[in-house]
């Protein structure tokens, strides 16, 4: 019986302890409930304050006119890419770019009497330039979207001789349908490949020899260009140009109307993710009236020759680019070539103090170049170029008919000019380029000109991507 009484005693003791703690736990529950009510009230007040502030902001937004969206800056490139069509007031402010260029040159032969043997002199864009330090050519470019329909570009060339000339000044449409675009004003012709590229974007200090011989440098048009880009995966571009034809090999005609034009086609594509290519064919037709040049006859006497007739030029161009997986920051290679052929038919005048003669003239002349540029390290490149010209078949009526000897046309004597160039450049940034170039120039009759040049280029301001 003793164990039973002991069990009752323990149960009673437990009940007494529990009853003693109930008031304490009830007090704790009340305290927790009070804290929860306080937190709920505090959060409710904060929510009401935020809702009130939100209502005020919504009222302000509803009564304030929306701000104009910030425009994208218009794209700029010496060979400009299709520009942005961003709106807003700032879109009417032109993007400004300045290219500062200069060099120092050591030339074996006198550059003042530089002439490419076998070809009619083509103007000031021929030759290696001056000896010693030369400020060279700098460029000032302004570009902008005029409105949603037109893009404008002005590029002025500032020479070291304190002269300013307009390289390009044109407007281009932005809103024509079906892949069409129309350009009007002064612009570099789209024929070939390198003709459209501004001098600061060349891979060498100077242009290929064939461009100097046949165009006197870069061929520009004062006129219009209509271009069509096909809506296909394969890049297909067709273009037609016309203008006043005043640049060599044409001249400004002494009458109203146009002077010839050009037809262009370019195609291109990618091969995998590392190789891309582009190829093209171009045709240029112009007329020349009294396209004059100075010469020396066989006795050293001064002669003024002048060509009048039709000039037609065909251009075939191709370029292949390689960059590992499309990333050209580390390594890349570019292989580029062009072939040009010019046919001219008309009359050639021969004028001296004692004679004024003229007879038929016909010439079939050509030239080509091949160059490769390899970027072997980030910002470091090496390149080599080979130039070749053929003065071809030249038929001079005054010579064929026995009126004058061939020596009377000294500059037109048969020749095969050549040049080999090598360059090495360093690009500390995308805005700076320092280039060292050495060339063996055999473009003259019998003089080899060894040319060593150090060039600098600096870009200031807006600077867009160059053409492919």
Language model feature labels by segment:
Residues 127, 170, 195, 275-468:
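Outer-membrane beta-barrel pore domains
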Residues 249-253, 267, 305-306, 324-326:
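Short helix-to-loop capping/linker segments positioned immediately adjacent to catalytic or ligand/cofactor-binding
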Residues 1-8:
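N-terminal secretory signal peptides that target proteins for export/translocation
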Residues 26-123, 235, 291, 455, ...:
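N-terminal periplasmic/intermembrane-space "pro-region" immediately following the signal or transit peptide
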Residues 238-239, 249-254, 291-294, 349:
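A short secondary-structure junction signal
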């Amino acid at each position: 019986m003793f164990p039973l009484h002991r069990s009752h005693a323990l149960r009673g003791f437990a009940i007494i302890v529990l009853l003693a703690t109930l008031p304490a736990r009830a007090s704790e529950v009340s305290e927790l409930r009070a804290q929860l009510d306080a937190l709920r009230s505090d959060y409710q007040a904060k929510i009401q304050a935020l809702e009130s502030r939100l209502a005020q902001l919504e009222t302000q937004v509803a009564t304030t006119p929306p701000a104009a969206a910030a425009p994208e800056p218009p794209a700029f490139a010496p060979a400009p890419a299709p520009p942005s069509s961003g709106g807003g007031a700032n879109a009417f402010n032109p993007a400004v770019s300045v290219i500062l260029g200069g060099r120092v040159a050591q030339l074996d032969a006198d550059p003042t009497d530089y002439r490419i043997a076998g070809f009619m002199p083509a103007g000031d864009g021929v030759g290696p330039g001056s000896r010693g330090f030369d400020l060279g050519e700098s460029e000032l470019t302004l570009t902008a979207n005029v409105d949603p329909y037109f893009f404008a570009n002005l590029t002025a060339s500032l020479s070291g001789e304190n002269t300013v000339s307009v390289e390009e000044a044109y407007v281009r449409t932005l809103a024509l349908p079906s892949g069409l675009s129309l350009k009007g004003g002064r612009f570099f012709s789209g024929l070939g490949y390198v003709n459209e590229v501004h001098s600061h974007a060349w891979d060498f200090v100077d242009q290929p020899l064939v461009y100097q011989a046949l165009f006197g440098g870069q061929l520009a048009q004062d006129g219009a260009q209509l271009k069509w880009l096909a809506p296909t995966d394969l890049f297909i571009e067709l273009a037609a140009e016309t203008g006043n034809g005043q640049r060599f090999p044409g001249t400004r005609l002494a009458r109203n109307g146009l002077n010839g034009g050009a037809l262009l086609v370019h195609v291109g594509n990618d091969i995998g993710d590392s190789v891309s290519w582009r190829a093209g064919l171009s045709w240029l037709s112009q007329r020349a009236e009294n396209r004059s040049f100075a010469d020396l006859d066989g006795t050293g006497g001064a002669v003024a020759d002048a060509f009048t007739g039709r000039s037609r030029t065909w251009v075939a161009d191709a370029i292949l680019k390689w960059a590992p997986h499309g990333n050209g920051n580390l390594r890349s290679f570019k292989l580029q070539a062009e072939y040009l052929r010019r046919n001219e038919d008309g009359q050639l005048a021969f004028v001296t103090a004692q004679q004024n003669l003229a007879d038929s003239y016909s010439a079939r002349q050509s030239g080509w170049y091949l160059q490769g540029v390899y970027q072997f390290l980030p910002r470091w490149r090496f390149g080599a170029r080979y130039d070749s010209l053929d003065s071809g078949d030249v038929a001079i009526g005054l010579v064929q008919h026995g009126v004058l000897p061939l020596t009377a046309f000294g500059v037109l004597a048969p020749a095969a000019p050549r040049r080999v160039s090598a360059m090495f450049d360093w690009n500390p940034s995308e805005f700076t380029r320092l280039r060292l170039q050495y060339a063996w120039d055999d473009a003259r009759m019998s003089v080899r000109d060894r040319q060593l040049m150090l060039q600098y280029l600096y870009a200031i301001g807006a600077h867009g991507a160059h053409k492919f």
